[in-house]
């Protein structure tokens, strides 16, 4: 289950997988793969499990992605 401190690999349809480290707001550094649990993607990931689909409303529009792995 995704929580703060998890390293999560997600994949949107037709895109390569991306890995993010979910951190607290003060530790966020999106350019280095560290996203806040309060960000749209981070919030959508919280409490999800491998194989689940999550949706997030981002500045670029709504995205849907599958959780590939959680470490």
Question: Where is each model-derived feature located?
Answer:
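Non-DNA-binding regulatory cores of transcription-related proteins
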Residues: 1-66
């Amino acid at each position: 289950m995704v929580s703060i401190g998890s390293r999560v690999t997600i994949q949107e349809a037709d895109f390569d997988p991306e890995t993010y480290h979910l951190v607290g707001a003060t530790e966020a550094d999106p350019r280095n793969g560290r996203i806040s649990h309060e960000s749209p993607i981070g919030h959508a990931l919280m409490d999800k499990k491998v194989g689940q689909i999550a949706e997030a409303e981002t500045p670029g529009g709504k995205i849907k992605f599958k959780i590939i792995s959680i470490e």
